[in-house]
Amino acid sequence: MKVIGAGWPRTGTLSTREALTRLGLPCYHMAEVALHEDYTRAWYSFLIERKPMDWKALFSNYSATVDAPAAFFYREIFAAFPDARVVLNLRDPESWYKSYMTLHGAMQDLSPHRHANPRLDMWLQVVEAIHEHSVGANADRDRCIAAFNAHNRRVQEEIPKDRLLVFRVQEGWAPLCEFLGCEVPYEPFPHLNEGADTVKAGLAFIFGIS
């Protein structure tokens, strides 16, 4: 594990995942948890059953991780991989909140299908546990934004400055490549933004919902 993404979902993590992949760093992301039942089970065991997580086994096929669920456990992952570098994606808190809640709502729209779909049910329990862990089960706007800001402060206080990049995807390749010690690719920085409807359609396909 070379790069730990500590930025919350909807801060440009999908673009960062694609950028790291293009730099030769296979990158773990919430999409992997949906796509691979073994990863869903691992997070279910950790978050719901409260069993220890084997971080090295979880990330054995990856050189980087961004987005949920891993971003919420950057401390534990950094302890397991102390030589890794940490990237903290930032975004305006108000625009982050609107995007995050829209996405969370899209995921919850799948809930009526969960009782006939055990794999979807397990994945939604993971999503709900992450939401409760990060902002609280019934958090309003102010609590969500406060939790978001508090997380970003903690990361900057706890991670050594020489191991941390505070990053906005609008900055493009230069700061990321300088931080990682690699050459800037001869291609535009990827700017990916999956809307809630696209995410919901993708999840419906993954979980076989028609």
Label every model-predicted segment:
Residues 1-4, 61-64, 84-85, 161-165:
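Short active-site oxyanion
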Residues 45-77, 81:
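Conserved nucleotide-sensing/catalytic segment adjacent to the nucleotide-binding pocket
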Residues 13-14, 71-75, 97, 173-176:
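Short, well-ordered alpha-helical microsegments
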Residues 5-7, 66-70, 90-91, 169-170:
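Short His-Asn-centered micro-motif
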Residues 21, 25-26, 32, 47-59, 75-166, ...:
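PAPS-dependent sulfotransferase catalytic domain
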